[in-house]
Design a protein with these regions (language model features):
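Active-site neighborhood of phospho(di)ester-bond hydrolases with catalytic His/Asp-centered motifs
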Residues: 28-29, 49-58, 76-81, 108-111, ...
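Active-site metal-binding motif and surrounding structural segment of the metallo-beta-lactamase
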Residues: 33-77
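Hydrophobic, small-residue-rich alpha-helical packing segments that form membrane-like cores
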Residues: 2, 25, 65, 69-70, ...
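Conserved beta-strand hairpin/beta-sheet module of binuclear metal-dependent hydrolase folds
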Residues: 1-48, 119-136, 142
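Metallo-beta-lactamase
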Residues: 24, 103, 113-211
Length: 211
């Protein structure tokens, strides 16, 4: 399995390259505008980027999905509630994408945005349960999502609470969380940590906004 986190220090954002070198396919989650790093990584790993996944429509930066799709011919996937104007494949909660031995499962986590989706990662070589979840803007290291970018702030806050407690915190305590933003990003609060990853168990115990 290929798993790489690509960080963007200027905006405090993170994107991900995921794939299976045995079958030569990969996907990029939440690509930044400058796409050369993904193309270089894919060439080095010997994989073709065939899929682009968006956790949600981003308010803090411009996505590189259009450029990356044009350069690779990859399909852009986003939750149906996003209703973007660009060409895309719309999915619902529970949708899965197979990349050889790797499965990416959509976990609809509305709140920050109505279409917001986390992606659970399953590697059949490691087991049947997710070993990690890409939480996007729903759960950060030491913080949680902002509700003020939702259609309605109060409904957004309720949605975030439900998504955290009914979709994410029910995962195994050992499940790794890899967020869409790191410390310093405007999408989080003062509690957001500079660490690039955490676990469900650690956040459940130490994240003050989950207590």
């Amino acid at each position: 399995m290929i798993f790489r986190q690509i960080t963007h220090d200027d905006l405090g954002c993170a994107s991900y390259l995921i794939g299976d070198e045995d079958v030569g396919v990969a996907a990029v989650v939440d690509p930044k505008l400058e796409i050369e790093e993904y193309l270089t990584l894919a060439r080095y790993m010997g994989v073709s980027i065939e899929h682009i996944l968006e956790t949600h429509n981003h308010a803090d930066h411009v996505s590189g999905h259009g450029r990356l799709a044009a350069a690779t011919g990859a399909t852009i996937h986003i939750h149906a509630e996003a209703e973007p104007e660009y060409e895309h494949d719309a999915f619902e909660d529970g949708w899965e994408l197979e990349l050889g031995s790797v499965r990416i499962r959509a976990v609809h986590t509305p709140g920050h945005r109505p279409e917001h989706t986390a992606f659970a990662l399953i590697d059949s070589d490691r087991g049947k349960q997710p070993w990690a979840v890409l939480t996007g803007d729903s759960l950060f290291v030491g913080d949680v999502a902002r509700p003020d970018l939702a259609v309605d702030k109060e409904e957004g806050a309720r949605g975030i609470f439900r998504s955290l407690h009914e979709k994410l915190l029910v995962l195994s305590k050992q499940t790794e969380i890899w967020p869409g933003h790191l410390g310093g990003s405007l999408c989080g609060g003062p509690g957001m940590d500079m660490k690039v990853a955490s676990t469900i168990g650690f956040e459940h115990q130490h994240n003050e906004l989950l207590r």
